[in-house]
């Protein structure tokens, strides 16, 4: 049964021009993976977002959708908004300003019957967009082969999985922004989209086989996977020494230097996501299909969150959650705990973490009401499949004249992937890294119709680009936070430790292919 009724929808139309219509289904046999395959396979643009909180507890809601109302893509100076009907609008200038401009005509209505934080925008912004925030930071020039600087999808229908109540909300928005559009016509169009999605969902699953032969990671051993890097170990270690010289000279306290690993892949990119969610479950699991390339994320780290409190009259809560300090997982519980204690007693790791907590406090202080910023969780251990981290949580009350986008801009990029002081660290990154970062160390996530933002730092992420029919190149980038007493070889190994989860996910699929 579809809700609200036409009569209720017509009443809601007096409150806004973008109104949700929904139908509830039992999630008896379907999972987010099977639903994506039924609904989104073959679509030019689609997404699937899932969450494993703290690396161990399944998040309540999963979101997926496809066939967006429009796509907003930034390349260099130009941002294009391409609508589903083929209409294209072109913008120039700061993309951080273009996005709110594109959202301005929408007056969405929210329904208390639906889960919080649904609908809206899904996508990413890449690292090089920092030049629109801080002009003193030089970035590498774009080439035609480079991925977009940013891409966001505005959806008017999506599926929401409730993992607790085991049900699915199929949601479509009635769009009243077209001149002359009646409430009845908008309502019927939304109902038609719901019916089409339900029809796809209720079809038998075809063409998706279990990952038979998939082999889980074997301890902390290096994966048997051939890859190349955009820099040699010697070049990376030389960059570490150069960074340490600048730290000793007082230019910076800390800087993050990265390397990018690439490897060929033959098969379905969605299988990479399926493997990654088994190997490296994380709070920000994401599969983005962007027409001819994919971004597959398993980030453990919040970039920024802006959330309403239970009291509608209260200010939004802004959150950053810096992660800094890493150890590999132990092969036994005792070894794991010993590594955790070693991490918490490591002066280098503690110094790095404290600096980044202070940076997070300062970033929030730029957009939060004075006196509200506080650290409510300090230096706890979070464990993931291949590594453990020191994590802290910093919160504040977003100032009344600031939006979620102001929060993101104030904190972009995260200090945990740049350094401190942030601006000088980014200038040094340009000098010490050989090429563009692209999506790496930027942000991905979603913005909902209640003005809330939930984003992750683009780390532990695969970028998948085509090289031929069913042939792809996968790139994985990882960095190490450098301080005065960093050991070059150890920092190089840390980048490999951070990349290991993604490399293992690829290796596991190779095992499947070899046995088939």
Task: Describe the predicted segments one by one.
Residues 1-516:
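Extended alpha-helical targeting/anchoring segments
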């Amino acid at each position: 049964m579809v809700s609200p009724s036409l009569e209720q929808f017509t009443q809601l139309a007096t409150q806004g021009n973008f109104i949700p219509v929904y139908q509830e289904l039992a999630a008896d046999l379907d999972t987010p993976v099977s639903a994506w395959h039924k609904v989104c396979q073959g679509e030019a643009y689609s997404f699937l977002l899932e969450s494993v909180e703290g690396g161990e507890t399944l998040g309540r809601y999963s979101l997926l959708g496809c066939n967006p109302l429009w796509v907003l893509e930034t390349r260099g100076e130009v941002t294009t908004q391409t609508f589903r009907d083929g209409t294209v609008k072109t913008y120039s200038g700061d993309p951080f300003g273009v996005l709110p401009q594109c959202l301005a005509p929408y007056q969405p209505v929210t329904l208390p019957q639906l889960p919080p934080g649904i609908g809206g925008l899904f996508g990413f912004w890449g690292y090089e967009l920092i030049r629109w925030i801080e002009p003193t930071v030089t970035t590498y020039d774009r080439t035609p082969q480079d991925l977009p600087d940013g891409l966001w999808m505005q959806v008017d229908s999506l599926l929401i999985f409730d993992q607790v109540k085991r049900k699915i909300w199929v949601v479509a928005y009635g769009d009243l922004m077209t001149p002359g559009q009646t409430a009845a016509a908008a309502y019927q169009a939304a109902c038609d989209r719901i019916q089409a999605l339900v029809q796809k969902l209720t079809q038998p699953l075809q063409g998706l086989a279990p990952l038979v032969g998939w082999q889980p990671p074997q301890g902390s051993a290096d994966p048997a996977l051939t890859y190349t890097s955009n820099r040699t170990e010697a070049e990376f270690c030389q960059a570490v020494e150069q960074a340490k010289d600048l730290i000793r000279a007082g230019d910076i306290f800390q800087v993050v230097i990265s390397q990018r690993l690439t490897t060929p892949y033959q098969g379905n990119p969605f299988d990479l996501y399926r493997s990654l969610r088994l190997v490296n479950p994380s709070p920000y699991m994401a599969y983005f299909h962007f027409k001819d390339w994919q971004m597959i994320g398993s980030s453990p780290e919040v970039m920024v969150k802006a959330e309403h409190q239970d009291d509608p009259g209260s200010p939004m809560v802004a959150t950053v959650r810096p992660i800094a300090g890493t150890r590999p997982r132990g092969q036994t519980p005792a070894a794991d705990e010993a590594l955790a204690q070693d991490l918490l007693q490591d002066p280098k790791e503690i110094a790095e973490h404290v600096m980044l907590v202070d940076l997070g406090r300062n970033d929030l202080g730029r957009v939060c009401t004075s006196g509200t910023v506080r650290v409510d969780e300090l230096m706890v251990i979070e464990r993931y499949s291949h590594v453990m981290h020191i994590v802290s949580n910093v919160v504040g009350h977003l100032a009344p004249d600031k939006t979620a986008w102001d929060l993101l801009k104030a904190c972009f990029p995260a200090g945990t992937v740049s350094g401190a002081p942030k601006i000088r660290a980014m200038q040094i990154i340009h000098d010490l890294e050989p090429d563009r970062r692209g999506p790496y160390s930027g942000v991905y996530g979603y913005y909902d119709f209640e003005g809330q933002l939930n984003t992750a730092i683009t780390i532990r992420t695969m970028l998948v680009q085509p090289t031929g029919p069913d042939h792809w190149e996968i790139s994985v980038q990882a960095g190490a936070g450098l301080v005065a007493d960093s050991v070059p070889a150890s920092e190089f190994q840390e980048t490999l430790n951070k990349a290991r989860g993604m490399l293992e996910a690829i290796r596991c699929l190779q095992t499947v292919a070899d046995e088939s």
